[in-house]
């Protein structure tokens, strides 16, 4: 099982996410089941683009996210959005398992 460290994302607007991407970070969202609100998070590009991590992301395996000051969350990848010509992720959507 792949484990990734994440931080909560406070700012959700376009300018804030662009600044994150320039800092080699990747914005992501964890969608919950039912009426619970989604959780916006920030991931480090180096953790995600590691060869073992890429394989796990594409296999749609269960991933364990460690978010600061919270219990670990088990998720699956719902969608990966890549930059058109750079080898960087733009955004990831996770679904809570």
From Swiss-Prot:
Domain of life: Bacteria
Keyword set includes rRNA-binding: yes
GO molecular function list: 5S rRNA binding; structural constituent of ribosome
Native source organism of the sequence: Blochmanniella pennsylvanica (strain BPEN)
Membrane-crossing segments per the record: none
Descriptive protein name: Large ribosomal subunit protein bL25
UniProt gene name: rplY
Keywords: Ribonucleoprotein, Ribosomal protein, RNA-binding, rRNA-binding
Lineage, broadest ranks: Bacteria, Pseudomonadati, Pseudomonadota, Gammaproteobacteria, Enterobacterales
Protein family membership: Belongs to the bacterial ribosomal protein bL25 family.
